[in-house]
Amino acid sequence: CHSAYAPEGVNAISYAARLISRLDALGESVAQQQDSRFSPPSGTLQVGTIHGGAALNIVPQSCWFDFEIRYLPGTRPQAVTDALGDYAREQLLPAMRKVAQRSDIHFQTLSHYPGLLSDPQSEFARWLAQWCGSDDFTTVAYGTEGGLFDEAGVATLICGPGSMAQGHKADEYISIPQTERCMAMLENLCAWMRADPSDSLR
């Protein structure tokens, strides 16, 4: 409806803002679960995009936003999504439907993969250290599909050149020395795959 009659419509952006505010509060609870092996030492929650409305003088009838939860291994992101869904269903929808009965709020999972915490003392880790020439294992804050393989029972470690310090920005790059180390590791891996399966770990 026209903004001159704003009380007669449900402002989708306003209700989306309330959901986002609730997410911020839930993010504080996520930050309380910490693991010093990671940096940052807690999971994170953030809204990355938001879209809504057609014109300044029209009450927006739709709004949608994307948010992500990056969670530590052993924690449950469902606790956040369940709490947000309860808030939408119990607090927001009743107020919205008092004005417009057909109002609704929908949630959709776009992607999901679990966190990963590999054992640096595993046999596979020892092989990888030999191929790389380094046993400097650490944790990272970004997500990979590694957690899916780990859940399926596949020994999983994340290894590769580059740093997120140079990622997701203009002129992102991987240095030549890092690329050369990666090639050496891949050559060692290929040599191992061609070797006799009975060969023991050296």
Predicted regions and their residues:
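Metal-dependent amide/peptide-bond hydrolase catalytic core
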Residues: 1-202
